[in-house]
Amino acid sequence: MEIYLDNLWDQVLERLQLQLSKPTFETWIKTATAEQLENNCLVIRAPNPFARNWLQKYYIKTIADVVHDILGYPVEIYLTTFLVEDSRKNDSGLIWSEHKSVNILGENLSIPKPLPANLNAKYMFSRFVVGPNNRMAHAASLAVAESPGQEFNPLFLCGGVGLGKTHLMQAIGHYRLDIFPHSQIFYVSTEKFTNDLIAAIRKDSLQGFREHYRAADVLLVDDIQFIEGKEYTQEEFFHTFNTLHEAGKQVVLASDRPPNQIPSLQERLCSRFSMGLIADIQAPDLETRMAILLKKSEYENMVLPRDVIEYIATRYPSNIRELEGALTRVVTYISISGLPMTVENIAPILNPKTEKLEASPEAVIKVVSENFNLSIEDLKGSSRKREITLARQVGMYLMRQHTDLSLPKIGEVFGGKDHTTVLYSCDKISQLQNSDLNLVQTIRQLSDRINFSSRH
C-alpha cells in the first residue's frame, strides 16, 4: 500500500496530543520525527540519545498502538538518533511499503553495527575527560590499547567508586575492536569470573573454562578486589594470568585499592598484579567535573547555563557516576516541569550534601523499616517480593552512605547477604535515582531522619 510518511506521522501526532499531557507531548513526542516505513518497521528519530531512551522506556508501546490503529496492522518501532537515508523514497516523500506477515527490519535500513554485549557504547576514549586526577591512567590505557602486551602488562587501574576505571577499561576494548574487529576482547567482573568457574566445576568442564579465558587477546577484569578470600578462584586466575602474560596478551585489572591492600590476596598474585603499572585515579577537581558535565551535555545535545553546570559540579565532588546521574536527573525534571533551567529551580531536586554523621546500623534499619511499613525481620529476610526487595536495597544503600561498615559487614546486618548483593543493591538504587524523582525524595527524607537520630 502507498503511505505518505509525513501524513502518517501527522496523524500519529494528532492522536498522541489528545492522549498525553501537554508538557509530555511537547517535550518528548513533538520533537521526534518519522524517518522511514519499510517491511512493517517504522523508524522514528529522536533529537538526542536521552530523548530516545526516554521514548523507549515510557512511550514506545503507546506510539506502536496508535500506528497500528491508523495502518490497520502492527508495526515494529525502531528508535534512533541517526538520520536515515532511504534510497527508495521518491521526490514526493512517498515510501512504498508491502504488508507482510512478519516484522523484519528493511535491508536498506541504516542501523549501527551491534557492539559486544559486555561493552558499553558510551565508554570510549573520545568521551573520557582527562584531568590532573586521571592523566596518567588515561595515557597508560591509551598506550595499552595501541600496543597491547608491551610496556604496561598488566595495567592495574586503582581508584574509588565512580572515578572512571570501568570507562577506561572498556575504552581499551573498543579501541582494539575498531582496529581489529575479530580480536578476542574479554571484559568481565571478578564475580562473573568466579561464577563461570563455579559453573565449570559443577558441569565438570574446567578445561573448557580455561580454554575460553586463555583465548583472550585482551582480558579486562573489573573489581579484582573481590577475589579476596576466594582461594580456588585465585588459583585459577593465577594460571590464566600466567598463560596470557607469557603469550604476550594484555591483562588490565581494576580495583578500588592497590594490590598490596587487598586482604587475603596470595603473595604471588600480588607480585604479578604489581609487575606492570599501577595507575591511580583520584577524585576530579572542580574544573574537571565541570568539563565532564559539559561533554556529557554536548553528547546529549543539551544546552545548560554555566552557573547550573558549576552548581551541579560543586554538589558532587567525588563520584563521576553520581555527577552524571545528577545531570540526568536535572534535565529530566526541567523537561517534565517545563521550568526554566536555573540554579533556583534545580536546587530542590539535587540530594543535598549535608555533613556526614556516623549512624548505627540499627538506626538505619529502624528508619527504613518504619518508612516502608515493614518489620525488621522482613528487611533481614530473603523474601523477593518487590516492595520488600526495594526496601532492602534502599537500606543497604543508606547503610553504606551513613556508616563506615564494609560491604561484607553490611551483608551480615541484612541477614548474611553476600557482599556482591550489597554492591548490586547500592548500584541499583544509585541508577534508579537518575530517573525516579520520587525515590530521590524518599532517600533524602530517610537520610535526614537518620542524621536526626544520630544527633539525638
Curated annotation (Swiss-Prot):
The major lineage groups are: Bacteria, Bacillati, Cyanobacteriota, Cyanophyceae, Oscillatoriophycideae
Q: What is this protein called?
A: Chromosomal replication initiator protein DnaA
Region Domain IV, binds dsDNA, as annotated, extends over 335-456
Q: Which Pfam families match?
A: Bac_DnaA, Bac_DnaA_C, DnaA_N
Q: What are the boundaries of the region Domain III, AAA+ region?
A: 118-334
Q: Which Gene3D superfamilies match?
A: 1.10.1750.10, 1.10.8.60, 3.30.300.180, P-loop containing nucleotide triphosphate hydrolases
The places in or outside the cell where this protein is found are:
Cytoplasm
UniProt xrefs under InterPro entries? AAA+_ATPase (IPR003593), Chromosome_initiator_DnaA (IPR001957), Chromosome_initiator_DnaA-like (IPR020591), Chromosome_initiator_DnaA_CS (IPR018312), DnaA_C (IPR013159), DnaA_dom (IPR013317), DnaA_N_dom (IPR024633), DnaA_N_sf (IPR038454)
Entry text on domains: Domain I is involved in oligomerization and binding regulators, domain II is flexibile and of varying length in different bacteria, domain III forms the AAA+ region, while domain IV binds dsDNA.
Residue numbers spanned by region Domain I, interacts with DnaA modulators: 1-73
User: Which Gene Ontology cellular component terms are annotated?
Assistant: cytoplasm; plasma membrane
Q: Which family does it belong to?
A: Belongs to the DnaA family.
